[in-house]
Amino acid sequence: MHILDTNVLSELRRPAKAHKKVRAWAAAVAVSQFYVSAITILEIELGALLIARKDAQQGAHLRAWIDGEILPRFEGRILPVDTAVAQRCARLHVPNPMSERDALIAATALVHGMTVVTRNVADFRASGVDVFNPWE
């Protein structure tokens, strides 16, 4: 099972323009194997809100994508930050702190025995989580 990082969701947002390796990988894996962290939802929500402040039309497109595609597509497969994830995340910060959001995504994957799918492999390496880069 795979937890998709924000950059993977963004890449697949417009399949015709997505990198061919990312498209091929996504097509080869059963949709039921794709999960997202609640932190990824936070990141795409934040991005949409920030863009909407500068460009209402683009913000509306992103809102439609989130509400019409992402949330329904991942219904039942959005993993929360619960006590086990919070405790695992805390351990990831000692002795070397890492980005809070990345640590929460990594901790979610570790608790659930999943692989993080991301272009930002280096951001997750220190956590010990299995990572896959579909661009390579």
Language-model region placement:
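A general structural signal for well-ordered alpha-helical segments in protein cores
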Residues: 19-22, 41, 63, 67, ...
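Residues that scaffold the ATP/ADP-binding catalytic core of kinase and kinase-like folds
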Residues: 11-12, 47, 88-89, 127, ...
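A generic structural signal for short hydrophobic patches within well-formed alpha-helices
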Residues: 9, 41-44, 86, 124
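A generic structural signal for residues located within well-ordered alpha-helices
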Residues: 4, 100-101, 127
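Active-site neighborhoods of divalent-metal-dependent phosphate/nucleic-acid chemistry enzymes
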Residues: 33, 46-51, 60, 72-119
